[in-house]
Swiss-Prot record:
Active-site residue numbers: K83
Protein name (database record): Probable transaldolase
PANTHER family: TRANSALDOLASE
Pathway(s) served: Carbohydrate degradation; pentose phosphate pathway; D-glyceraldehyde 3-phosphate and beta-D-fructose 6-phosphate from D-ribose 5-phosphate and D-xylulose 5-phosphate (non-oxidative stage): step 2/3
Taxon lineage: Bacteria, Bacillati, Bacillota, Bacilli, Bacillales
Catalysed reactions listed for this entry: D-sedoheptulose 7-phosphate + D-glyceraldehyde 3-phosphate = D-erythrose 4-phosphate + beta-D-fructose 6-phosphate
Organism: Bacillus cytotoxicus (strain DSM 22905 / CIP 110041 / 391-98 / NVH 391-98)
Places the protein is found: Cytoplasm
The protein's Enzyme Commission number: 2.2.1.2
Primary localisation category: cytoplasm
EC class of the enzyme, as a word: transferase
Alphabetized InterPro entries for the sequence: Aldolase_TIM (IPR013785), TAL/FSA (IPR001585), Transaldolase_3B (IPR022999), Transaldolase_3B/F6P_aldolase (IPR004731), Transaldolase_AS (IPR018225), TSA/FSA_arc/bac (IPR033919)
Family to which this protein belongs: Belongs to the transaldolase family. Type 3B subfamily.
Gene Ontology terms: biological process: carbohydrate metabolic process; pentose-phosphate shunt
Length: 215
């Protein structure tokens, strides 16, 4: 499973990239708005840092306007992926983008059949949301597993991005259940690196080393 970072913060992206694990970036209008910067300029800046796919989301809800926006986003850099909501209009736009050779990430996927529809429309990626399903008493990981099984049965090449990741257990279970990618906030990436036994082990090694230097 590959790791994307879910942010529009350049410093967070650079820090994750330095770890050698970063395969791509996902953004959304809320994340960019939080940065208080021009949307297109920030996407261009991110594409200059990361070689992998960078998802940039359209704002419009009508297919023709989504297509217009997406074409402009795709001009920013060759690694831009146009992020489209899972709606009827979104599916129309995905089909048009597929015909144009523009890669897409269908977001706000909450059922396996939505993922299948998006894949058949030509989506490059689908993004099932884990945390938001968990919030309403559903098991988001069941969705990842269902989508992975359906795609495997029908030999579908669309990649599954586990989104709305809240903690390290989400990441582990997404990998076990067939997600190709997990897109993760910076704070969760930081948590993945840490384990209390690792810290204890380092402390013990250092303490033992200091004892040898005292002799």
């Amino acid at each position: 499973m590959k790791f994307f970072i879910d942010t529009a913060n350049i410093n967070e992206i650079k820090e994750a990239n330095e770890l050698g694990i970063l395969a791509g970036v996902t953004t959304n209008p809320s994340l960019v708005a939080k940065e208080g910067v021009d949307f297109h300029e920030r996407i261009r800046e991110i594409c200059g840092v990361v070689e992998g796919p960078v998802s940039a989301e359209v704002i419009s809800l009508e297919a023709d306007k989504m297509i217009e926006e997406g074409k402009e986003l795709a001009k920013i850099a060759p690694n831009v992926v146009v992020k489209v909501p899972m709606t009827k209009e979104g599916l129309k736009a995905v089909k048009a983008f597929s015909d144009l050779g523009i890669r897409t990430n269908v977001t706000l996927v909450f059922s396996a059949v939505q993922a299948l529809l998006a894949a058949r429309a030509g989506a490059t990626y689908v993004s099932p949301f884990l945390g938001r399903l968990d919030d309403i008493g559903h098991n988001g990981m069941d969705l990842i597993r269902q989508v992975a099984e359906i795609f495997a049965i029908h030999d579908i090449e669309t990649e599954i991005i586990a989104a709305s990741v809240r903690h390290s257990v989400h990441v582990t279970e997404a990998a076990l259940n067939g997600a190709h990618i997990a897109t993760i906030p910076a704070n969760v990436i930081g948590a993945l690196v840490k384990h209390p036994l690792t810290d204890q082990g380092i402390e013990k090694f250092l303490a033992d080393w200091e004892k040898t230097q005292e002799k």
